[in-house]
């Protein structure tokens, strides 16, 4: 299962009661963070989650409201006695940008391993996370992310016996290991059926609606998408500033066939997003106005 927390929902600047947009997930003891604006570490503390377990930090782009909180977070992670390396993922220029921010956090008790995304779409596997970065349409290079948790096929004892797999290897093979024993190589597909549907989360902020968002979000269990503007009369602002309205995000969710939509990254002038949800739900009924620390646990389909 995948624990998901929308740490903040504000765009451009933090507001009283609304931190800057960021997402955190937990999976098998490993945490992943997408974006880290001013105050993100406070939002993590308010949620009661730990800095220590953050193994992966992804950045959508390098505007200040998405990255300015990184030095403080890194210092807090160091103070939490973290020593394991942290993987940092982001668009081209990642190491240069992070190095500049680290002027105030030059010494850390852990390494930063940088993965710069340069292609329109790239897949990165870290721990049990399958991370897919995809280019979106903002006024700087910007990426959305899908986070997938793969699920193995069902264990089929008859298949294991037919393939003469020793019983003592069954457990390790079910965990995805490949084992060499007595001059034979045993692989998971010798005891498992077809791969089952896993968990899929899609996160997209700072973009105009583009086809690749629909493509990447297809069938997501949860789609977290920016809704900078709820007011229909601000459609021109959305176009000019390369953002989205609630209604454009809802249309993306509808076309992608997602199960649930959470809106986020609200304009500072948008103080009551719930007032615009009635018309949003007319487009996509399972749309919800994101709130700081809104959380859910996504689980595997028990019928699979």
UniProtKB/Swiss-Prot annotation:
Enzyme Commission number(s) of this protein: 3.1.26.11
Keyword tRNA processing part of the UniProt annotation: yes
Cofactor(s) this protein cannot do without: Zn(2+)
Active site as annotated: 65 (proton acceptor)
Keywords: Endonuclease, Hydrolase, Metal-binding, Nuclease, tRNA processing, Zinc
InterPro entries: Metallo-B-lactamas, RibonucZ/Hydroxyglut_hydro, RNase_Z/BN
Binding site for Zn(2+) 2: 65-66, 206, 265
Reactions catalysed, as given in the entry: Endonucleolytic cleavage of RNA, removing extra 3' nucleotides from tRNA precursor, generating 3' termini of tRNAs. A 3'-hydroxy group is left at the tRNA terminus and a 5'-phosphoryl group is left at the trailer molecule
One matching Pfam family: Lactamase_B
Subunit structure: Homodimer.
Family: Belongs to the RNase Z family.
Protein name: Ribonuclease Z
Organism of derivation: Lachnoclostridium phytofermentans (strain ATCC 700394 / DSM 18823 / ISDg) (Clostridium phytofermentans)
Gene: rnz
